């Protein structure tokens, strides 16, 4: 079984038109090649794309497929400047422990599945800490996989700032799979 080659192409116009820039590895700054990004085609791998250079600003998780305009990746605007390849876990195993309080305290829940609503599924208002035991995951600030996104790989996160969030507003999450 061969591993897919990572490849992402950014276009300055909608529907894959206009100038384009292609990446097959991490790129800390491509905004000098494209002044804006209105569509993306991912032909291999999974990616984190960032609004600002050096992997900063709002991030968006993209898997293989076509994104004909920035609304399709749930972007807030047409600004993207850097990207990273997501190294998916081998074996396809996923396991996440979430905690209602910081430093892994309070009620703990363990899951191996996507969650469109933390409130409905676990009856908690917010996630204050978590442990990614297997796989790579994305947290969303709103239910049903909307709002700001946060990429989490295999490690422990004692507080929301550890996964890049200024607050604990995680209302949904899912596994990142190719």
From Swiss-Prot:
Q: Which domain of life is it from?
A: Eukaryota
What are the residue boundaries of the Beta/gamma crystallin 'Greek key' domain, all occurrences included? 6-44, 45-87, 94-134, 135-177
Any GO BP annotation: visual perception
The UniProt GO MF terms for this protein read:
structural constituent of eye lens
- Post-translational modification N-acetylserine, affected residues: 2
Print the keywords alphabetically.
Acetylation, Eye lens protein, Repeat
User: SMART domains, from UniProt?
Assistant: XTALbg
Q: Which InterPro entries match?
A: Beta/Gamma-Crystallin, Beta/gamma_crystallin, G_crystallin-like
- Region (Connecting peptide) residue ranges read 88-93
Q: Where in this protein does the record put region N-terminal arm?
A: 2-5
**Family in the record:** Belongs to the beta/gamma-crystallin family.
> How does the entry describe the domains?
Has a two-domain beta-structure, folded into four very similar Greek key motifs.
Subunit (UniProt): Monomer.
Q: What does this protein do?
A: Crystallins are the dominant structural components of the vertebrate eye lens.
Q: What is this protein called?
A: Gamma-crystallin S
Please tell me the species this chain comes from. Macropus fuliginosus (Western gray kangaroo)
What is the gene name? CRYGS
């Amino acid at each position: 079984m061969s591993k897919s080659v990572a490849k992402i192409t950014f276009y300055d116009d909608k529907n894959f038109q206009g100038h384009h820039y292609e990446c097959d590895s991490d790129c800390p700054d491509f905004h000098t090649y494209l002044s804006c990004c209105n569509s993306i085609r991912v032909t291999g791998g999974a990616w984190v794309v960032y609004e600002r250079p050096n992997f900063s600003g709002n991030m968006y998780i993209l898997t293989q497929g076509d994104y004909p305009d920035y609304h399709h990746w749930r972007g807030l605007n047409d600004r993207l400047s850097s990207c990273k390849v997501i190294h998916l876990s081998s074996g396809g195993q996923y396991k996440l422990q979430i905690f209602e309080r910081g430093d892994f305290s309070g009620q703990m829940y363990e899951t191996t599945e996507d969650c469109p609503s933390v409130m409905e599924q676990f009856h908690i208002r917010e996630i204050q800490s978590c442990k990614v035991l297997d796989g790579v995951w994305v947290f969303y600030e709103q239910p049903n996989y909307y709002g700001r996104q946060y990429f989490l790989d295999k490690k422990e996160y004692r507080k929301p700032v550890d996964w890049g969030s200024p607050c604990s507003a995680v209302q949904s999450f899912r596994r990142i799979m190719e």
